[in-house]
Amino acid sequence: MILILEGIGGNVHSVRRMIQKSCNQTVKISNKKSDIEASKTIILAGVGHFDSIMEKINSLESFQLIQKRVLNEEVNFLGICAGMQVLLDRSEEGTKNGLGWIEGEVKKFNQLDSDGNILKVPHIGWNSINRLRDSKLLNKKMADERFYFVHSYYVDCLDKKYVIATTDYGEKFDSIICKKNICGVQFHPEKSHIFGLKFFENYFS
């Protein structure tokens, strides 16, 4: 069973619909301990302020169980957008600590690109990814993968061996990261049409 954590970030119903199109597994939106225990994959679809999301996570009665399942039992965990950002240690957007499951920091985009031109922030729209290493998350036959982004802050992973792909927007940022069973994507697969569908097909294969 695939579990999308409830009441933390937005877009959960859109994420569920896209996952249901991509695989034949049961998908639930819940924070119940029984569902967390039964899940094979846990998804955090985060949209919102870093501190607000961390407050909601820390207030969950099931938070310790989630940590146990992810860190000790190594159940698969996927963070989407801000759900990816809270996997790291800290963010320039807020003052609260992140989960710290992957070392790194979340930084705000500069207002100017490398040529001194004004950079529109937030980064909204379609963008491509630069593959750094092979991963089952990416389709080898689809070299021109493009995904839909909406964010003002970006992930800077400390250990680059966990970075699967980067994206260019004024500067390079980490757009897909994976450390063992824990993965994060900065883009929105649920808004990325055929590319998002294929991403979920690969992830759940």
Task: Mark where each language-model region is.
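N-terminal beta1-alpha1 cap of cysteine-dependent amidohydrolase-like domains
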Residues: 1-77, 91, 105-107, 114, ...
